[in-house]
Amino acid sequence: MKYSLCTISFRHQLISFTDIVQFAYENGFEGIELWGTHAQNLYMQERETTEREIDYLKDKNLEVTMISDYLDISLLADFQKTMEKCEQLVTLANWFNTNKIRTFAGQKGSEDFSEQERKEYVERIRMICDLFAPHNMYILLETHPNTLTDTLPSTLKLLEEVNHPYLKINLDFLHIWESGADPVDSFHRLKPWIQHYHFKNISSADYLHVFEPNNVYAAAGSRIGMVPLFEGIVNYDEIIREVRDTDHFASLEWFGHNAKDILKEEMKALTNRKLEVVSS
């Protein structure tokens, strides 16, 4: 397993992609998970500079692990526009040399779907996968509240319903724990589809609401309860023991303040634990 940082951690800071790449390299990250908004802006407005940074990434054996975006598959959406956005993401993914696109399976809880609604969402997800498949690109659905992948049973059912070789999972361990499932058991049951992990933690279940999108994306949103991996309620020592021998990236998804300081310390803690395993 390798570690990547998320550019979304720097969503409210004035920091260049150049600085992020250098920071990642200096602190032992092997990849960068690129927020879709950042990817689009770099391609449209800073193409020449970014091309140099992409070359720098290669030289330092770093990579863009995934583009994390949001594809609207709601029945009220203009699905043609969603498919056009998928075409744009193919261009971006090729440019950044990645073959993974993260999105969400809708915007409401799995229990709130009628049988017919679910069928229509399944068909839309399959169509999106069909668009990316000729480019050898994978769609990764994130395990997340208020989506069709908000519980382990619904996630497994959705994978079976869509039944597409280019549909995969980004396993967010905090959110699968939030659903009431055991994170390690979830890993084993979803393992055939997993292509990426999200690592983050919280001090108490009382503060899980701080990860709701409207709060996360607000510059003045609450960050109470957001804590480093090994200081929270989810047991990451146990999780890492299970997943460390896999070939996937784990992104440290830090949404709180002082992103550079926290990410630097997280990598030190992860490195120390790795050294302890090797020496024991």
List PLM regions with ranges.
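Histidine-acidic metal/acid-base catalytic patches
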Residues: 1-4, 9, 14-28, 58-61, ...
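N-terminal-biased segments
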Residues: 5-18, 35-50, 81-86
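Active-site-proximal loop/turn and secondary-structure-junction residues that shape catalytic pockets
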Residues: 9-11, 36-38, 70-73, 105-109, ...
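Active-site acidic/histidine proton-transfer and metal-coordination neighborhood
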Residues: 19, 56-59, 75-169, 261
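Conserved beta-strand positions in the central sheet of alpha/beta enzyme cores
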Residues: 33, 66, 102, 140, ...
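Glycine-rich, proline-tolerant flexible connector loops at the mouths of alpha/beta enzymes
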Residues: 33-58, 106-112
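Catalytic-core regions built around general acid/base machinery
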Residues: 48-60, 124-131, 186, 238-242
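The substrate-binding groove and active-site-proximal loops of carbohydrate-active enzymes
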Residues: 71-79, 227-230
